[in-house]
């Protein structure tokens, strides 16, 4: 018996010795390893994933770019500058695959099951390694995605400060910084009636304090934009809602944000992200046109631009191209959340955009806009619930970036070839006449137009040539 006890004691001693002399811990995400719980952990999160490089259209490597060549110049601008791609922290590092009907399906090896500040710091390190391997310089965040909520506002701010200091340190020696930051004003029960449109004045004040802090940390990290997405800013029924008062409150909230932006010296763009519904039945920023009207009514049109999300366009009954053009012609196109939805599904599926035709239309708007900076293309998109390998995170972003790159190449081809532009020019050719110019310059009243109508007689109406336009478009694919 004593021999057995001695043997067990010897094994324990050997095990302890090996722990003391072991190499620093790593986090082999691709090998199913476990992470250290230490705040100071510094291992590799993706040791089996190489730095993603451009290999050209003939490549069969899923971990390589086929169409996105960051340094390639197109229309006098590097491809990376056309896009300014960004990774969404919430989907990439907080998405679990859970849905209203099922539990989480993604268990990334670096997660320890807690919502601690220590775990938040680990995720931030993973984020920076992910960005560097993709070759992406921007990322986006909600305040409560990157740091845990506390029991008080002061505790929440302290948690956020700790994680932000790590992010600031990780930024050193790189070009990485936030494309935009925002405050999460929809998850906590206090925001069930909204934040800026809540029926409770105390909630309004709390939301303002949270946005104030989120603006500060975005500015501190060198963020280039700040986003307002009003997931709870709307109503479930008008029977218990004072819509006019709520919209006035929302405007006062935005006015305060503009004032604070100027006070702290934040030079970034303030962005409103339209969405018609979900989680609220009816949101006040339903679509680009609704948001533009709100900004004009309250004298905020020169202080904000719009962050257009393609899936939100689907939910509002529009195409992404429609929303982009609405924003562009109003001088409000500020950023694009590059994702797509499912036309057969009535909710926000947040899929990576892989439709080359849709990407081409998106890029036609961006080219006409002269680019998107200081905004960019944020991949507000998540893996499917059934995609559970770590490499899927990379493959999804590579696919999305390649799709947008193909869209850019196609859009340039269409615009330079000129047939589509010529078709549109011919369709509106009568407006280049003397009468057309008089109307466009506001010099033709109804009496004058009546006189002209009698002179012309029954007007000729030409074909719109939609099928030809579609043929020209498809030929570039």
Curated annotation (Swiss-Prot):
Mn(2+) 2 binds at residues 309, 312, 348, 350. One of its GO terms (molecular function) is xylose isomerase activity. Its EC number is 5.3.1.5. InterPro entries: Xyl_isomerase-like_sf, Xyl_isomerase-like_TIM-brl, Xylose_isom_bac, Xylose_isomerase. GO terms for biological process: D-xylose metabolic process. It holds the Pfam family AP_endonuc_2. Signal peptide: none annotated. Its cofactor is Mn(2+). It catalyses: alpha-D-xylose = alpha-D-xylulofuranose. It comes from the Eukaryota. Mn(2+) 1 binds at residues 273, 309, 337, 380. The active site is at residue 142. Keywords: Carbohydrate metabolism, Isomerase, Magnesium, Manganese, Metal-binding, Xylose metabolism. One of its GO terms (cellular component) is endoplasmic reticulum. Binds 2 manganese ions per subunit. Belongs to the xylose isomerase family. HAMAP family: Xylose_isom_A. This is Xylose isomerase. It comes from Arabidopsis thaliana. The lineage of its organism: Eukaryota, Viridiplantae, Streptophyta, Embryophyta, Tracheophyta.
